[in-house]
A protein has these predicted regions:
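A generic structural signal for alpha->beta connector loops
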Residues: 43-45, 82, 103, 129, ...
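Hydrophobic alpha-helical segments typical of transmembrane helices
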Residues: 27, 31, 35, 71-74, ...
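Residue-level "edge-of-site" marker
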Residues: 52, 114, 171
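A transmembrane-helix-recognition feature enriched in membrane-embedded lipid enzymes
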Residues: 3-56, 95-104
């Protein structure tokens, strides 16, 4: 056989997701958003506050607490622009959900180790004026809906790309799809869009200290409406 050792290397979920990536055009995504918005109001009485805080242009990190698998969909519905999502690479292999998140613009990220490719790609997207969703908890919240400790990656990326953060509080989502259940339940859900958080590096701070301070502020803002 003449195959090189590189071609024989096993492919990860992230590799497969990258090679099969196909994002729907914005007009199609907006139609899907309208349909999903109607379904979300019907089944979960999803409501929104603070929509005036949404920037429809310019680079922005959209950061939220993470209560259920449906969070990224609910978060995106008020937008009329392209959004990218950092999603667990393994989720691209799930039936139905894997295809949907790929069509809607999700990018794979390996959560068990530093994924420099995903981080570099996201940072460039932001610098080009794009919007990207990041869940600072790194996973779903506690069963009672309370926050996990926030990782500093979102704030660090915002500092590097010189972009603001749009904090979002999702309230009630943990009752829709509790951990251990295979299907969602009916429950009221509310999303609060807070004013933009403009990250800064203060005099005398290094990048790590600034990112941690901004992360703590982000967590405090999101927790204020839980």
């Amino acid at each position: 056989m003449s195959e090189s050792s590189q071609s024989m290397a096993p492919r990860t979920r992230a590799d497969e997701a990258q090679s099969k990536s196909f994002v729907l055009p914005l007009w199609a995504i907006n139609i899907i958003r309208l349909i999903l918005h109607a379904l979300s109001r019907l089944f979960w009485r999803v409501s929104y506050k603070g929509l005036e805080n949404i920037p429809q242009t310019g680079g922005v990190i959209i950061a939220s607490n993470h209560q259920t698998y449906i969070d990224p969909i609910w978060m995106s519905l008020p937008f009329r622009r392209e959004i990218r999502y950092l999603a667990w690479s393994e989720s691209f292999g799930w039936p139905i959900i894997g295809k949907i998140i790929r069509w809607l613009g999700a990018w794979p990220i390996q959560i068990k180790k530093a994924d420099r490719t995903a981080i570099r790609r996201s940072r460039q997207w932001l610098k080009n004026g794009g919007a990207i969703v990041i869940f600072p908890e790194g996973g779903r919240c506690l069963e009672d809906g309370k926050l996990l400790k926030f990782e500093a990656g979102a704030a660090r990326m915002a500092l590097e790309a010189n972009t603001p953060i749009l904090p979002i509080t999702i309230r009630g989502g943990h009752r829709v799809w509790p951990k251990g259940y295979r299907l969602p339940h009916l429950a009221k859900v509310e999303l609060i869009f807070h004013p933009l958080q403009h990250v800064t590096m203060r005099e005398g701070e290094d990048a790590r200290t600034s990112a941690r301070r901004e992360t703590d502020q982000l967590a405090e803002t999101i927790a204020s409406e839980l």
